[in-house]
Amino acid sequence: MNRLNESVEGASGVGEPFGPRKLNLRIAPGVTTGHMMTLLFGSFFGIAMMGFINACQPYLFTEVLNVPTAEQGPLAGNLTFLSEILVVATIGIIGAMSDKFGRKPIWAGAFLIFSIGYVLYPLAQTVEQLTAFRLFFALGLAMNTAMLPSVINDYAVEASRGRLISVCFMLNGLGFILLLTPLRLLLPYFEGIVDGDPVLAARYWLWTPAAVCLLVSTGLLIGLKPGAPAQ
């Protein structure tokens, strides 16, 4: 009878409480407060670090690559299209890899790729190089897109999963608002300290989110639950 009760209790997803009582969030066995805080930390930075790559492109097109204004719209569209194709083509493989090797290396790897991508992007000297760097960055997009819902699914019991998704997506939006605007405002500052050199300004500007992404990657590598989901 006791075993039957334990089985029913596990299926109903009681779990351990986490966070404010009003949220009524409960986490799965083996998941600690540290793991949950790391999930929320990664959620805050995800959308902002993915979105800034689009925000920086007009400056790169105009000031670094000297792309004519009439060609910038089609170029931006092509970059987005190719990026989405790569995401669609790889996201299933990434999910399968995370089932085998764990969420931690994949999600931390996503932000490491973002970091390297932001270092490379302003170094592009041709549209072809920029496209190659954007496709490399898109691999990180696929990894981040796949891992956030996967980690949520692993960490919350079934009854709390919807609420945790809402919290994480709220942090996504909050991070987008609080991070993207300050990053945009850094460009005039960097233009000032390099005496108006657009190439150097672009590099310093994009290397700022590169540093942020490296810190996030390190935090995820330290704080997420180790092992594959079954472990």
Cite the ranges covered by each PLM segment:
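Central cavity-lining transmembrane alpha-helices of secondary-active solute carriers
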Residues: 77-95
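Symmetry-related core transmembrane helices of the 12-TM Major Facilitator Superfamily/SLC fold
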Residues: 199-222
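Primarily marks hydrophobic transmembrane alpha-helices of the MFS/SLC 12-helix fold
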Residues: 104-107
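C-terminal ends and interior cores of transmembrane alpha-helices
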Residues: 112-125
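Glycine-rich segments within core transmembrane alpha-helices of 12-TM secondary carriers
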Residues: 165-188, 213
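Core transmembrane helices of Major Facilitator Superfamily
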Residues: 136-148
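Pair of pore-lining "gating" transmembrane helices in MFS-fold secondary transporters
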Residues: 24-64
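Helix-breaking motifs and short loop linkers at transmembrane-helix boundaries and internal kinks
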Residues: 102, 123-128
